[in-house]
């Protein structure tokens, strides 16, 4: 697994999934994105595209705290670099 994907997974775990201020549906979506990224049976670009789709869907949630939205946007930017 690429180092970039490992870093993205770590950021999602530490700053979204484990943050109890973040609504449950957003944490669940971040967990889904992590599962997709860790599925090594698929090409890294496909995993990144699937994770982007999941995270983009929740990025506009009005209940998302602003600091979490910023983290999601940063993760989306990093995922776009995965090839």
From Swiss-Prot:
Pfam families per UniProt: UPF0147 (PF03685)
N-terminal signal peptide: none
Coiled coil, from the record: none
SUPFAM superfamilies the record matches: Ta0600-like
HAMAP family tied to this protein: UPF0147
Family that this chain belongs to: Belongs to the UPF0147 family.
Protein name: UPF0147 protein TK2131
High-level lineage: Archaea, Methanobacteriati, Methanobacteriota, Thermococci, Thermococcales
